[in-house]
Amino acid sequence: DITAQVQQLVGRSGVKTGLCHLFIHHTSASLLITENADPEVHRDLERFMARIVPDGDPLFKHDEEGPDDMPAHVRAVLTQTSLAVPVAGGRCDLGTWQGIYVWEHRHAAHHRRVTVTVLGS
């Protein structure tokens, strides 16, 4: 959950009304806005994605980094590598139950870089 860090960056930008754009610099992770109240939502999303893009599928030949390598790329393609969030009142204008997340598609945690650009006045 990177919501607090993003809100802090938006606040420091001085922009009151505008747009916050986020971009992840990786091909095996993605960004999403989803419910922030019930952790079961995240587990359900993981289970769903594992069902439609299973690790170790013999269809995938790109497996140099392990059986989760190519499935992670496919999962990233099926989701989002960038987000655009409106800024109002100097904050990301998210719904009550919305949070901004980096979704890691590999089994092991990796360092991920996200660029946040805030535009507006």
Predicted regions located by residue number:
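Active-site histidine-anchored catalytic micro-motif
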Residues: 1-121
